[in-house]
Amino acid sequence: MKLCYHCMSQISNDKASTCPVCGKSLDPEEQKPRFLKPGTVLGGKFIAGYHLGSGGFGNTYIGWDQVLQRKVAIKEFYPEQYCGRGQDGLTVVVTDERLISRYQRGLQQFLVEARNVAALHDVQGVVEISNFFEENGTGYIIMEYLEGMDVKTILKKSGNKKDYEWSRRVILTVLYTLKEVHKRGVLHRDIAPDNIFVTKEGIVKLIDFGAAKNVTVMDSSKDVWLKSGYAPIEQYRNTFEQGPYTDLYAVAALFYRMLTGQKPIPAVD
C-alpha cells in the first residue's frame, strides 16, 4: 500500500505509475528548496505530501495522519524573508543571525496561536487544529483538511464579486463565528478574502489566524503586519490597542469587497 502525495489516496497497486483518484503521477517531482520533500514524516506520525500553497510566513502541505488514517493539512512556520532550508532538506535556518530573536518570537507566537485556536474546537466556523509541535527548527500545525475554495478564489471565478444573498450569508456566518471566538478572548487579526474558506458542502470557516505575522515582519521599526484595505487604523501602530472591533472593521471591508468587486480603501486614507 502506498500513498499518492498529491491527494493522499491509498493505492493498493504498488506498480501503479499514476493515481487512480486524482490522475497525477506517482513518480517523485522536483520541489523548490523551501518545501519539504513529499513523504517526510513529522511528529512521528504525520506524512507531508506536496505543498498546497505558501505565503510570506509559511508553507501548507496536504498530509496524512498515520494513526487516525485520514487526510490533514500541515502548516509550517516559514517566514521566507529571512530563513531557508538546511542541507538536510528538513531544518529551517535563519539566514541572518541578527534576526534570530525575531524569528524565535514569531515561532513562539505561531505555537501560542495554534494553542488558542485548538481550544476553539467546538466552534463550527473555525478550522479545527488537532496537533501542533516544534521540529526541524520550526513549528507545525496539524489541521483538518478542507475541500472547497477560499473567498478570494471564489471571487476570481465569479467576475470579481458575488450577489447580495450569497455575500450576506457568508458575512453573517463570519460574524456569528467571531462572536464565539471573541468570547474566548481570541482575535483573528487577518480577516480577508483569502482567510475565509467555503467548503464543498457550503460550510464557512475562518482559517489562518494572524497573530504570528505581527512579529515576523522584516521592518524592525514596527512589529505589525497588515493587509491594506482590511486592516483598521489600530493595526498600523504597535502602540494602538486592538480588540473585537479590529476584526469587525475587516468584516465590513470584506462585505464591501464581495458586493462591489473593488478593493476597500486603506484605513490611513
Residue ranges of predicted features:
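Conserved end of the kinase activation segment
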Residues: 234-245
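Protein kinase catalytic-loop region centered on the HRD/HxD motif
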Residues: 174-186
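Conserved short submotifs of the Hanks-type protein kinase catalytic core
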Residues: 136-150, 154
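Conserved activation segment of eukaryotic-like protein kinases, specifically the C-terminal portion
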Residues: 221-235
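Activation segment signature within eukaryotic-like protein kinase domains
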Residues: 170-171
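AlphaC helix of the eukaryotic protein kinase fold
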Residues: 87-119
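Activation-segment/catalytic-loop signature of the eukaryotic protein kinase fold
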Residues: 131-132
